[in-house]
Swiss-Prot record:
Reaction equations catalysed: xyloglucan + H2O = xyloglucan oligosaccharides
UniProt GO molecular function: cellulase activity; xyloglucan-specific endo-beta-1,4-glucanase activity
N-terminal signal peptide: 1-15
Name of the featured protein: Probable xyloglucan-specific endo-beta-1,4-glucanase A
Subcellular location: Secreted
Length: 240
């Protein structure tokens, strides 16, 4: 969920195919490739009684990336500890000018007592380089009772987007309005046009089409669990 982190680049890469790299375990460690930035992002580790997390790049062929994160977090019930994620590198684009955001994602989780979500995290602003005003999350999994930000605790709508049923929640996160689409069942092999979710919000929930899409990320937010390994075997996205 949080993405405004100090940019400490662990390495740089060319557009050529990349193989596995050593895991990174620092709070703000990152790895960059031609199109993606992989974050360990332990933004909420202070909420935990104890724990750790490491994230690593497995491969990147220029269009599709594979990566993993291993974590254990205890304490701080109901509080997110981190957001290991991959961000797509692109120029901010006004929603009215978007044609498509095709994405595929194959992932799996192993471990004990997992409370976490697996989600896309998109941000928009009224200008290309302004502060974020909307956060759009697309939850492919709500594990162990994990729940989204919500003003009421109840879904505000149950739309069908991309051929799949979702419960839509809304609430504030600082200065941002957060919309969270939560899948009706865990989806470990996902394919959709993410622009369909943005179109729905513009048409049905009043999000202005003048907003700029500034960030597209995908990853997992742990609340608690032991010896968890989250593996993305294949992930792709583009913005057009």
């Amino acid at each position: 969920m949080k993405f405004l982190t100090p940019l400490v680049l662990s390495s740089l890469a060319s557009a050529a195919a990349l193989n596995r790299r050593a895991d990174m375990c620092g709070q703000w460690d990152t790895t960059t490739t031609d199109k993606f930035t992989l974050y360990n992002n332990l933004w909420g580790e202070g909420n935990a009684d104890s724990g750790s997390q490491c994230t690593g790049l497995d491969s990147d062929d220029g269009n599709t990336i594979a990566w993993h994160t291993s974590w254990t977090w205890t304490g701080g019930a109901g509080q997110v500890k981190s957001f290991a994620n991959v961000a797509y590198n692109f120029e901010a684009t006004q929603l009215s000018q978007l044609s498509s955001i095709p994405s595929t994602w194959k992932w799996e989780n192993t471990g004990s007592d997992i409370v976490a979500d697996v989600a896309y995290d998109l941000f928009t602003s009224s200008s290309a380089d302004g502060d974020e005003e909307y956060e759009i999350m697309i939850w492919l999994a709500a594990l162990g009772g994990a729940g989204p930000i919500s003003s009421t605790g109840s879904a505000i709508a149950t739309p069908t987007v991309g051929g799949q049923s979702w419960s839509l929640y809304s609430g504030p996160n600082g200065q941002m309005t957060v919309f969270s689409f939560v899948a009706s069942s865990t989806t470990e092999d996902f394919s959709a046009d993410l622009n369909d979710f943005l179109k729905y919000l513009q048409e049905e929930q009043g999000m202005p089409s003048s907003q700029y899409l500034t960030h597209v990320q995908a990853g997992t937010e742990p609340f608690s669990g032991s010896n968890v390994k989250f593996t993305t075997s294949s992930y792709s996205v583009s913005v057009a």
